[in-house]
Each structure stands twice: as structure tokens, then as C-alpha cells.
């Protein structure tokens, strides 16, 4: 079964735009769980423009599903993850001022750096995932670094899907097969939506997890959070 992890960063963005605590990020996360989400994802950035470190600490003891913290592994980020001990940490190669993730790791160039991080998090009992594109070599070096999983960066798929679904999914099927052959788990995320999620899941049914935030929260403005989560989970049913 492919798990749906809801990224709640956009909820925090809305809260921070006005100040105060409305919407309540913690309540939304707990409601997502109650409505069927199998995980919660947060991406705390250095400027705390959406999720704050205090949110991460507040969420950890309250969540009953998988907690995934993603981000660039700066010393501050590593320290936060080791203190909070989520179920999973997803490493992304973002610059501090980046609006959103837009590429996977060059795992070959960063092999020693990533290997050390995999060891650090692994010793703490935290499952590791490295954000990568579909290049076979990058996936192979993620395995060499000791990653438990990779998360495929799916923006190229989402962009091409409306024009040519078969061409859009083809490199991701191959990347998914390589990942499976190397014994790693498989996650996916970035620009997945109700438009393109079911097609991806149909062709890669062994996905362990999809992390979805922007599209899901946008859909919830029209359908409500409960129905939206149900619709996304329907896309993940065989």
C-alpha cells in the first residue's frame, strides 16, 4: 500500500501571513491523520517562513502516523532531526532562500557527505530518504551512500503529463525499477496532484509513499480537507 503523507507547509504559510495561530498547524496535522492520511511531512527552512522549529517540536509527540522531516542537511537541521527523532528524514539539496525544491541531489559528487549523514541518522534509528531525479547513476550512488529510500522528484512528470502521459511516466518507471533492484524503498513527491497521481500509481504500484502539499491544500479550499484526502487516497488504491 502506498502511504499518503500530507505536507503541511502551505498551512503554515497561511498562518504566518497574518500572524497569530489561525489556521492552527497542529490541529490541521491531527485532522489530516483523522481523515486518513498515513503521514505528515514538514520542511522547516532556515528563515522559518512557513514551518517553524517550534512547530516541529510540538507536532512530534502528538502525531500517531509517520512523521517525515525534509530539508537541506545544515548543522542546524541535523541537530533538529536528531533531537526530534521523526520516523523519516528526507534530504533535499535546497539553497536557504529557495522557494521550493527544484532538483535532486548529485549523489555521486556528494557521496562522502551523504554517507556520513546516512550513518548519523541511521545510528539514531531514523529512516533515511534522499531526493533524486530519475538518473540511474544518481540512484545507484544514493544506495552506495546507504540510503533506506529515495524520493523521486516528480516535477518533470507533472509538467509533461498533460501533453504525453506515456512519455512522462517512462523515465520514472525505469528509475523505480532501478531503486527496487538496489533494495531501497521508493517515495515520490513534487507537483503530484489529483490530475496525475493515479496514473503514476497505476504504473508504479510499489511506491511506498507520496508526499503532497501544495496541490492537496489548494484542492482543500474547494472540497474541504476531509474529502480532499479521501480523493487522494482513492488515487492510491489499486
UniProtKB/Swiss-Prot annotation:
Its EC number is 2.6.99.2. It is found in: Cytoplasm. Pfam families: PdxJ (PF03740). Pathway: Cofactor biosynthesis; pyridoxine 5'-phosphate biosynthesis; pyridoxine 5'-phosphate from D-erythrose 4-phosphate: step 5/5. One of its GO terms (biological process) is pyridoxine biosynthetic process. The keyword Ribosomal protein does not apply. 1-deoxy-D-xylulose 5-phosphate binds at residues 45, 50, 100. Its main location: cytoplasm. 3-amino-2-oxopropyl phosphate binds at residues 7, 18, 191, 213-214. The record marks 151 as: Transition state stabilizer. One of its GO terms (molecular function) is pyridoxine 5'-phosphate synthase activity. The active site is at 43 (proton acceptor), 70 (proton acceptor), 190 (proton donor). Disulfide bonds: none annotated. It catalyses: 3-amino-2-oxopropyl phosphate + 1-deoxy-D-xylulose 5-phosphate = pyridoxine 5'-phosphate + phosphate + 2 H2O + H(+). InterPro entries: Aldolase_TIM, PyrdxlP_synth_PdxJ, Pyridoxine-5'_phos_synth. Keywords: Cytoplasm, Pyridoxine biosynthesis, Transferase. GO terms for cellular component: cytosol. Homooctamer; tetramer of dimers. Catalyzes the complicated ring closure reaction between the two acyclic compounds 1-deoxy-D-xylulose-5-phosphate (DXP) and 3-amino-2-oxopropyl phosphate (1-amino-acetone-3-phosphate or AAP) to form pyridoxine 5'-phosphate (PNP) and inorganic phosphate. Belongs to the PNP synthase family. This is Pyridoxine 5'-phosphate synthase. It comes from Phocaeicola vulgatus (strain ATCC 8482 / DSM 1447 / JCM 5826 / CCUG 4940 / NBRC 14291 / NCTC 11154) (Bacteroides vulgatus).
Amino acid at each position: 500500500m502506498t502511504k499518503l503523507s500530507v505536507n503541511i507547509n502551505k498551512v503554515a504559510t497561511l498562518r504566518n501571513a497574518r500572524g497569530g495561530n489561525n489556521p492552527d498547524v497542529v490541529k490541521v496535522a491531527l485532522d489530516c491523520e483523522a481523515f486518513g492520511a498515513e503521514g505528515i511531512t514538514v520542511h522547516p527552512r532556515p528563515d522559518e517562513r512557513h514551518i517553524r522549529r517550534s512547530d516541529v517540536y510540538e507536532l512530534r509527540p502528538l502525531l500517531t502516523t509517520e512523521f517525515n522531516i525534509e530539508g537541506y542537511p545544515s548543522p542546524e537541521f541535523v541537530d533538529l532531526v536528531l533531537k526530534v527523532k521523526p520516523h523519516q528524514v528526507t534530504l533535499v539539496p535546497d539553497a536557504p532562500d529557495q522557494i521550493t525544491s527544484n532538483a535532486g541531489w548529485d549523489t555521486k559528487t556528494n557521496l562522502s557527505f551523504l554517507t556520513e549523514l546516512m550513518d548519523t541518522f541511521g545510528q539514531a534509528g531514523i529512516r533515511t530518504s534522499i531526493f533524486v531525479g530519475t538518473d540511474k547513476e544518481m540512484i545507484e550512488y544514493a544506495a552506495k551512500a546507504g540510503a533506506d529510500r529515495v524520493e523521486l522528484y516528480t516535477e518533470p512528470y507533472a509538467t509533461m503529463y498533460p501533453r504525453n502521459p506515456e512519455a512522462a511516466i517512462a523515465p520514472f518507471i525505469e528509475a523505480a525499477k532501478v531503486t527496487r533492484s538496489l533494495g531501497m524503498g521508493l517515495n515520490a513527491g513534487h507537483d503530484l496532484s489529483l490530475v496525475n497521481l493515479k496514473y503514476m500509481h497505476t504504473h508504479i504500484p510499489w511506491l511506498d509513499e507520496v508526499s503532497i502539499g501544495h496541490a492537496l491544500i489548494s484542492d482543500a479550499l474547494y472540497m474541504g480537507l476531509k474529502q480532499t484526502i479521501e480523493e487522494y487516497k482513492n488515487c492510491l488504491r489499486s
